[in-house]
Amino acid sequence: MKVKSPLEVYNYLPRTNCGECGFDTCMSFAAHILDRSVTPLDCKPLVRDAEKDPKVKKKLEELLELTAPEIAEVVIGVGENAVKIGGEEVLHRHELTFFNPTGFFYDVWDTMDDKALEERCDRVVSYKKFYVGNFLTLDGFAVRCTSGDPKRYREVVKKVASYGKPLILVALDSECMKAALEEVADQRPLMYAATEGNWKEFLKLALEYKVPVTLRAKDLDLLKSMAVTFKQAGVKDIVLDPVTEPLGEGLKGTFERVIQLRRTAIAGQDKDVAYPIMITPIAAWLIEGDDVTKSYWEAVIASIFIVKYGDVMIFRSIDQHVVMPTITLRFNIYTDPRTPVQVEPGLRAINDPGPDDPVFITTNFALTYYTVESDLTSGGIKGWLLVLNTEGLGVEVSVAGGQFTASKVKELIEETKIEEKVNHRYLVIPGLAARLQGAIEDETGWKVLVGPMDSGRIKGWLEKNWPPKE
């Protein structure tokens, strides 16, 4: 994004403070454009005026260019399942944040029998993992043409498309690619891949069907040349594949090419290579060894490039030892460091508690909250859980930083009216907040019990300490 201050954006806006965008002032709207929560197209008066006045239209186009991300954003698929890739602004997450999580696509191929194809598609579509308040899912399918038969490939693509997930069409033969596009072009699949040998045919297909296309070349000069050619021909949605090699010097070379592409695009301001990057961890299946070894290296490759600039990936393995670590890593890398993951503060009733059941307190840091809530629920423990607003910080950090205090605990007790729900005045605090025991007792008038350091030990702790002895 070329603009750095809200005032620069403000000068392009109507400056009427009409509020149609949902913000009180145009300056506030300008600030939210900078943090990417809205776009200039959300300014309705500006868009309406641009349709009538060529000068305003030019002004809007200039603003869109100025506020465009450093790396082009490409959309794969349509509707609510569409996957956005690219759109990044910085080389390092701590400089701002990373915006669009890496797209995870899993391969199927057109020589699979129908039953195996359906089973594999069902596994991908049904995968769901609950993690700190979010359900993590897989993004789509990469349909590989291994038969060389355009008719068969089209049939399989149609069947896979019926699952409603975004598609990557993996075929080097232009006839097979054309057959698939005739079937699913309206679903905006990503073409994979235009190479030195087929780029002319793929360029025609990208223009004809108006779908995004991947350019593949190990030589970065060639890759850039292809990108320039496609851009000048009118193709806007481009993905770059610098070729993923799975081991040793090959993997080192892949890493260096990816770093060079992204640094050139952002630090070097070279728009000719400022596109999302494709990584293919599936390349690990080309190495020698058993399936466990191959899938292990697939997870290793994916992990490297989730951290370093991989915007979209193609996988083979859908085993838990590959999916769980990579999808969890993706979530954590693409969590906004400016805003800790947190839950709403307040009172939670766990396992239908009664007036004589214990009252616990924890912070609203999502990882802490869901760990405690899960341990209480799975342990069959009936209790009341107070969730304190610590601005998304964990127990030890918030105690040290002043977000977890006796006065805030008192306010929470009063706001939730927990005193009306229980017959006792005992509060169980986390072991890491033990230093606050006396202060909370003085502030609230409640008797404070110091619980275990680990919420997984609450059940055993209660057996010894609840009900409390007077």
From Swiss-Prot:
Cofactor binding summary note: Binds 1 [4Fe-4S] cluster.
Binding site for [4Fe-4S] cluster: C18, C21, C26, C43
GO biological process, one term: methylation
Cofactor(s) the record lists: corrinoid; [4Fe-4S] cluster
Pfam families named in the record: CdhD, FeS
The protein's assembly and partners: Heterodimer of delta and gamma chains. The ACDS complex is made up of alpha, epsilon, beta, gamma and delta chains with a probable stoichiometry of (alpha(2)epsilon(2))(4)-beta(8)-(gamma(1)delta(1))(8).
Protein name as annotated: Acetyl-CoA decarbonylase/synthase complex subunit gamma
UniProt source species: Archaeoglobus fulgidus (strain ATCC 49558 / DSM 4304 / JCM 9628 / NBRC 100126 / VC-16)
Gene name tied to this protein: cdhE
